[in-house]
């Protein structure tokens, strides 16, 4: 459950932004580049959290 929650928390903002772009391509002008980059990088932090979660539950 913890891994699925971590995956969902990390990837949801990125996918929401992608779906928003799909329905409204003009949104790229309204959302700043740092926000786009943050969501993109936050999604790729998910594999970094997995060993931490595994280690925490292995104690």
UniProtKB/Swiss-Prot annotation:
The GO terms describing molecular function are:
G protein-coupled receptor activity
Question: Per the record, GO CC terms?
Answer: plasma membrane
Provide the alphabetized UniProt keywords: Cell membrane, G-protein coupled receptor, Membrane, Receptor, Transducer, Transmembrane, Transmembrane helix
SUPFAM superfamilies (alphabetical): Family A G protein-coupled receptor-like
Subcellular location, in the record's words?
Cell membrane
Membrane topology listed for this record = Multi-pass membrane protein
Which stretches are Cytoplasmic in the membrane topology?
Answer: 1-2, 59
InterPro entries according to UniProt: GPCR_Rhodpsn_7TM (IPR017452)
**Residue stretches spanning the membrane:** 3-23, 38-58
User: What is the first-listed, main subcellular location in coarse terms?
Assistant: membrane
Highest taxon above the source species: Eukaryota
The record places the following residue ranges in the Extracellular compartment, namely 24-37
Q: Which family is it part of?
A: Belongs to the G-protein coupled receptor 1 family.
The protein's job, in short, is: Receptor for gonadotropin releasing hormone (GnRH) that mediates the action of GnRH to stimulate the secretion of the gonadotropic hormones luteinizing hormone (LH) and follicle-stimulating hormone (FSH). This receptor mediates its action by association with G-proteins that activate a phosphatidylinositol-calcium second messenger system.
Protein name, UniProt field: Gonadotropin-releasing hormone receptor
